[in-house]
Amino acid sequence: MQKNVYGARKRAGQIITMKVIQKFPVSAEHIMKCAAGSTNLYKQHIMHALMDAGYTATVFGELYQQLFSKDSPDYISSPVKYPDVYEVLDSIHDAGGIAVMAHPAEYDSFDLIEELVPAGLDGLEVWHPRAGEEERKRIFAIAERYDLLTTGGTDFHGMYTSSPLPLGTCRTPEESLDALLNYKTKKRREQKKAMQEVEMSLAVSNA
């Protein structure tokens, strides 16, 4: 699944790059240079190249809206088909991970929470820079209702962020971090026990 998503995003980046160089005298090589060190090419890298070329002074501004706002007549895109959310949950758990929904307030994902809890959603991101106090209270209350983990963070993207937020300005409280670590330990024990039961069952079958 991860390879499929990576490939789709790579193709989308290439298509968008071609559309950009048709509009502006920048090279694909320069755009790719701006994405050096990244796992993929993103809109911010394209804006970085356009900044270098003198077409804008900021990553997020009028030109960004002109190129990447769906309502703009100059909108350029290459839609990426993402995996089904249930497949994503299964993949996270199969890899030994904990599935947490990122900033539900920003994407208005509240209705989806109730749907995903039975499918194995483990937690919700409560503390996020763009979530107001009332939104945080709402998310936390939902997490308590469904006995979900709670996390937080700055959503730090370095220079590629619309609002500069230094690392550590929005953190997961210690009690939530402890719950997260304890949950991980519990899951590991459950997985180990399940593997032992499978091995014992196979041993009996082969006896």
Feature-to-residue mapping (PLM):
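Conserved phosphoryl-transfer catalytic core
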Residues: 7-34
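Short coil/loop linkers at secondary-structure junctions
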Residues: 23-27, 56, 149
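Charged catalytic cores and adjacent phosphate/nucleic-acid-binding surfaces used
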Residues: 2-5, 80-101, 105-207
